[in-house]
Amino acid sequence: MGIPTRTGARLAALATMLLALASPFAAAATLRIGMSDDPDTLDPAVSGSFISLQITSVMCDKLIETDPQLTPIPGLATAWHWSADDLALTLSLRTGAAFQNGEPFDAAAVKWNLDRYRSSPMSKRASQLKPIKDVTALDDHTVRIDLSEPYAPLITMLADRSGMMLAPLATMAAGESAGAHPVCLGPYEFVRRVPQERVVLRRAEHYWDPSKLRLDEVQFVDIPDATLRLTNLQAGQLDLIERVAPTDLDTLRGDPHLKLAATPALGYQLIIFNLAHGPQSDSPIGRDPRVREAFEASIDRDTINQVVFAGQYIPDNQPESVGGPYFDPDHPVPHRDLARAKALLEAAGQGRVGFTLLISNDPVSAQVGQVIQSMAAEAGFDVTLQMTESVSLSQAADRGAFQAAMQIWSGRTDPDQNISIWVACDGFLNRGRYCSPPLDKILGAATRTTDTALRAGLYRQAAAIYLEDRPVLFLQHYAWLWGANAKLRGFAPTPDGLIRVKGMSLAP
């Protein structure tokens, strides 16, 4: 049976690599995880891909962790409290912890990391931490974060990349190359990376809680083809695979040596448009919101879900799940309307509109692109699909070398980090350079209160703006579908899609 891969050479390379994984090097205490992509960088300050977050979450503990229900729990900060005016957050830090190279973990290290995240020219966390005015080490194990204004998402930020602690001396010595060999404070430390093949981690010698480490090694293996991931899971060459193709679920369920783990996801898929980022923004789809509206009217989210995802996902037009507290019911998921699409193009003075859609070159993304291409053609759009590696796609989008690009976001518990990142003027994933000062004002107000009802009202006001301007089109929310060796113990899928390796083991 033919298995689709990137190229014949890529398949040969994967076969060679997987034979190596089946060798004595892959001992019983080695967890081998099949991933859908290669990480961009392993420096939490710079990275923007979910695969990078997945790997760095195993290497780098955060100041605040989350439990399987995504409730904040102690991490490297054992306790925290807000000041009465919500302008200062004080953290009590864990004692007896050290970085993977032996550097001490203390308040000075926390201050250095937070200052790096919010001020380094390379940092993609700077806009997320903009409300931080100062970070002060009160003593060796107490840190105070002072804010210029109340900032509700801060706890969520410290439970994300911005809360990951890197060893200051090692990171300063590495400079811009810190992501090539990151040194964190976490359960498994970096060993090596073979680009487009794997990242290898080993049990950290200095970890503060060794009782939770039941694996000697963790390998993240890059296999973009979902069916190929499943094939290697069945062959025993992998122990856990992410993003099982919905069309492969019956095969997985029918194998007594495997098990399925599934949960609704915070993550979603979307298309971003280049509105003002370099020469490629000068196109009808970038210049005119009526053309983007016509494009949305030409596609059918339900059809995409049924054809590509076997009905397992949730069609959506917003970054929050349908029916959730921050979803705007006044703007429900629109149905396909070809007549309206054609009328909008005519009103915009356009005949047929051509543009290039940049997509990742995994088979599932290709299928989504092909379905969209076919539907949009009926309305008057000539969509050229440009397939590329996910890292190359992100790099192209960062420099404005795109007209439209398909993206994935793993989702966050705080609504600000599901929308501001894409549409705020300084959003770190606002690659199309959309900017609406009235929208920024509303989004800013929503971060300054913790009142759910008030925030929901503000995010609905925001939705009325970005759904009209359409700098992005949300397509669907995912379900996390994992395949696992039946011998794997301790794995529990969570809505954020992260693998919590601590406590996991492989039975003999």
Label for each model-derived stretch:
Residues 206-251, 289, 373-374, 382-384:
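Ligand-site clamp/hinge motif
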Residues 81, 92, 126-170:
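Surface-exposed binding/hinge segments that line
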Residues 195, 313, 324-325, 334, ...:
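Ligand/substrate-recognition segments at binding pockets and active sites
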Residues 290-293, 305, 382-393, 420-486, ...:
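Extracytoplasmic/peripheral linker and loop segments enriched in polar/acidic and small residues
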Residues 34-84, 112-115, 180-184:
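N-terminal lobe/hinge region of extracytoplasmic solute-binding protein
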Residues 151, 159-213, 217-219, 338-339, ...:
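Gly/Pro-rich hinge or "lid" segments in bacterial periplasmic/extracellular proteins
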Residues 32, 106-113, 140-146, 186-187, ...:
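Alpha-helical secondary-structure segments
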Residues 203, 261, 286-374, 461, ...:
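Append "and occasionally in soluble cytosolic enzymes with long acidic Gly/Pro-rich linkers
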